[in-house]
């Protein structure tokens, strides 16, 4: 294993010594916070701001970062460079102050590119599955004692964090296509899990522009780099001839270089075989449910093969994978006055992701009534994929629909949850329930849940906090039961 001497890098590149303090506007996001954490471990002074406290903010504070709640121009005092997330508007006072003071302002992906510049980078892109695939790759490399640096968009449960500074040359990271900033990255291996219409405002509302951007992402690889792509995705299959780089394919497709077969699932695990060119087949036991996660695992296997990681390390990492926060995360049973229900939480916020969650839940618990509480994310996404959302959400037995999490967007008429409720009601005859705010969701769930139900909370907004509330409620119920037994 090749060790990285960070001090030597700074000596070799004197310009890096000029950067003393790095300020992050929107530091509480998983991607921004992850980069900040790695830089903190590299020895940089970190400051930042966000609109609210969260676990990422608290963790960074524990590492010595100075973090402000709320955005004010004075927050950037002392910064050598300012990093902004995609959620930051052009009129943000810290951004304006940095521009006025002529402090360099860079986007998240540009800073990630700097981290990747001196490392063997693996960049994972695609509309869906980025976080899980990146986590699986990081877990395999860790199991193989390669000690990678990683930056992931979700909490890797086994590490207790979404970012880590490793001491090897490997950097494994998500490549965010939402603002096309992933084009800043120059990795050695690029993964594309799938390509669907999303973030279309970035791409002029033109799917061809989105496809062209993914081709450019692959072509940013050096001529000796490798593209790892899913052959099951029809769009990717169409684009492969344009990549002009060594390409390894994976999937259930008969022609895939890393091919999945004999898939089966039992509750929260799955089993399948993986066939590889000029190598024996592997029998994989994956500690995740769903065919979509089998595809994510196949991508991770294909990447690991590029670095000659042994089959034992691959199999062991996948078998013992401890999961990711808010990715089909199971909280076990919780109790209401009407009985016990199983609670599962998921971050997916695109119709395809919601469909994958529903399919995995149905396969794991085929006899249970499926109750979903869903929070749409962004008005533009709801507008652009309205018909798909209406179709997918109508498949659950009982739907509770929270209003759209705006993520800084202005409301769009007809692209809201009340409209979705009406459409689903008219087309399916089902009765979705509109929920005015996440705060009232636990009480509403308590009124409609029956004994034996499966409850899915889903979305990329603040609905995740509801799960914590339900878990705390369950803990209090158990404490009261114990107290009554003692008396």
From Swiss-Prot:
It is an enzyme of class 6 (ligase). GO terms for biological process: cell division; cell wall organization; peptidoglycan biosynthetic process; regulation of cell shape. It holds the Pfam family Mur_ligase. Disulfide bonds: none annotated. Keywords: ATP-binding, Cell cycle, Cell division, Cell shape, Cell wall biogenesis/degradation, Cytoplasm, Ligase, Nucleotide-binding, Peptidoglycan synthesis. It comes from Psychromonas ingrahamii (strain DSM 17664 / CCUG 51855 / 37). This is UDP-N-acetylmuramate--L-alanine ligase. It is found in: Cytoplasm. Its main location: cytoplasm. Belongs to the MurCDEF family. Signal peptide: none annotated. GO terms for molecular function: ATP binding; UDP-N-acetylmuramate-L-alanine ligase activity. Pathway: Cell wall biogenesis; peptidoglycan biosynthesis. The gene is murC.
